[in-house]
From Swiss-Prot:
Stated family: Belongs to the BLOC1S1 family.
Protein name per its UniProtKB record: Biogenesis of lysosome-related organelles complex 1 subunit 1
Localisation per UniProt entry: Cytoplasm; Endosome
Organism annotation: Arabidopsis thaliana (Mouse-ear cress)
Loss of function: phenotype: Longer primary roots and more lateral roots in the RNAi mutant.
Gene this chain is encoded by: BLOS1
Pfam family, one: GCN5L1
Keywords, alphabetical: Cytoplasm, Endosome
General function of this protein: Component of the biogenesis of lysosome-related organelles complex-1 (BLOC-1), a complex that mediates the vacuolar degradative transport via the intracellular vesicle trafficking from the endosome to the vacuole. Probably regulates the PIN1 and PIN2 homeostasis through its interaction with SNX1.
Organism domain of life: Eukaryota
Tissues where the protein occurs: Expressed in the whole plant (at protein level).
GO cellular component: BLOC-1 complex; endosome
């Protein structure tokens, strides 16, 4: 019964059983390897997603910080311009008040100057009248002297 033919036949009959056992072991190993790969992939995807989320949040924080700094820089210039504009407007109002005061003073000086001119003119007129009166008085005096000399 243990002839080479019977052994090979027996082996042939056992081969499919061994192959089946081997293929089950291989499939279990393959299945566990695939499960391991899936688990590793899931873990790495989760880590990558977390890292991406952290990076995204950090980028948002940095962008917000940059935007705040830019706003502060721009607002600093705008604020300075606004302060300067208010200062200029205040100076304009003060200058307008000063110009109005000087205008009133100029009008007063013109009125005083006109009054002085009128007074000087009147003095000049009075001086002329006095000279005329003096001349007339001299004429009258001379006429009276002549009359008085003629009577003597």
């Amino acid at each position: 019964m243990n002839t080479p033919m019977s052994l090979s036949a027996a082996r042939g009959r056992m081969l499919p059983f061994l192959e089946k056992e081997k293929s089950e072991e291989e499939s279990e190993t393959l299945e566990s390897s695939l499960l391991q790969l899936i688990d590793d992939n899931r873990r790495s995807s989760l880590q990558l997603r977390e890292k991406t989320e952290r990076s995204r949040k950090e980028a948002i924080r940095h962008a917000a910080r940059t935007a705040d700094l830019l706003v502060k820089a721009v607002n600093g210039g705008v604020e300075e311009c606004f302060v300067n504009e208010k200062r200029i407007e205040s100076e304009i109002r003060n200058l307008a008040i000063t110009v109005a005061k000087f205008g009133k003073q100029t009008d007063q000086w013109l009125a005083v100057t006109h009054a002085v001119n009128s007074a000087v003119k009147e003095i000049g007129d009075f001086e002329n009248w006095m000279k005329t009166m003096e001349f007339d008085c001299k004429k009258i005096t001379a006429a009276i002297r002549n009359i008085h000399e003629d009577q003597q």
